[in-house]
């Protein structure tokens, strides 16, 4: 057993990398630790490419084991079930970072597994997972170009915080994860509280500087392990075939990419591709396969579009580099929903619906760092059905992409939501992508803002989002505003920014190349701000503040009762509160502090529930007159029900000014009489009838 270990300090944390003790049959295996948080990272790759493989089959799976925090799973089977949203998002985070570092043409299957085996309640495992993946890939021998580093950045009181703890993040205006190589940033994922572009860019630069120590130590660790790289040779380019496609079909391809409508353009490109295959397949003595012709046809497509952009020709749909596509904005189009909006930007369209529910509808989330489940009162779900791109497909489980896009849109909105105390609803927003041609997640941000305001949610400010792109060849580059799907596919960067007129709420960046500069990011942020303000201006012309007159908005309130009245409200075995719910058809929840939350979609139902709760929990007032029912006669007086579950004693001496020998001579059970509360003694109610009678 040849164990190798490397330790270094990163900010306030101690990072340790170890290999040679666990999972020795994997091609690369590292036990990575950040303080007491430990993850086991394994890398396995097939030595050969599958026949006909035309894509890079990289899979990254981040798995949180409940035993890592001394817990047993709560499911019936007592095993970890399907991936949580956190696991899916972390898997995507790492995948997006490492994918650009594999060489073009490498098609061997690679599986990366990250297992959290010990979790500290203060340290998020995602950063150490990223560093562990970097180390495991570096020692595995696969053609992974260079180590990566990653760090989380917070921002509080005008200062950046490196790898903040969970507690520090609660007081931070920024939660940003940045990853990249020693030369460039490859990935950014962030959520912010309306911060300026300058602060956001400064955080990216700060993170890049801080994770250099990790890259240096991972490189040294790789050298110490001494793993040999695979003898992988990149496929040789068929220059003759590439030249033939350019010469024979280049002009047609260039012309096709001037067709503005996506489906028409794709149909024309498909026709040209089929013509190229028919003309060039088996043309030379070695024979060109249809797959090979199609492969190089895509290369010509890519170079054609990129050259047009770099030469400052008009873009595919005729726009210049800084123009946002035409917008069409509608609200309230679904008549029986609480709030709705249809946001259309060019050929991208999102139908966004807001639903308001009681606090009891909150999503319960289990987290490694928390011993108790936490309530999530804001949900944003993103759906991408196949029809939105003119295709058929299976409607199976939620895809990773849908989870990721929904999370990004949620991050763009969260900073502007009211607190649960200010707005005691569970809010669910669903974005149905009904058409897609680029930047559907940012359309979801815009549609969500509109839909929330239509539902009457008092958001702090309208929010809009925009996706930026990049085409770069050597020193030439062009930043594109509001990219199309083809520009995203054929370009070098996907840079998404969401925020208000005051600042940035969310920033996500994915890079396909390794030479993104500070200047490029600065230009992208500047253009994104201009576009965001433009979109907000058009959105504000349709709706700029919450719709307080929406008749579909549910009614809710919180009534504060004394804690000793909780049992009166609940009743024996829940009989009282169940009766109120059944009678009023409202939703009612009460907590241990005496907060009673009443919710209903109907005004009459709501009013009935409120009155019934007040009646049951009301406290009699001294000197107030009540009309009560005689419920029991005793020798020393009578018990009078003056409120629901509230009986008071009318003493025989308080029935009349005259001497009363027998109570039944004056009142009988079932009689309704007026009485006055003359005293409260340790919960006992003292009543008088005679004070209301003339002497």
UniProtKB/Swiss-Prot annotation:
Name the UniProt record assigns to this protein: Polyribonucleotide nucleotidyltransferase
Top EC class, one word: transferase
HAMAP family membership: PNPase
Subunit organization: Component of the RNA degradosome, which is a multiprotein complex involved in RNA processing and mRNA degradation.
Keywords on record: Cytoplasm, Magnesium, Metal-binding, Nucleotidyltransferase, RNA-binding, Transferase
Gene Ontology terms describing biological process: mRNA catabolic process; RNA processing
Cofactor section: Mg(2+)
Substrates-to-products reaction catalysed: RNA(n+1) + phosphate = RNA(n) + a ribonucleoside 5'-diphosphate
Domain of life: Bacteria
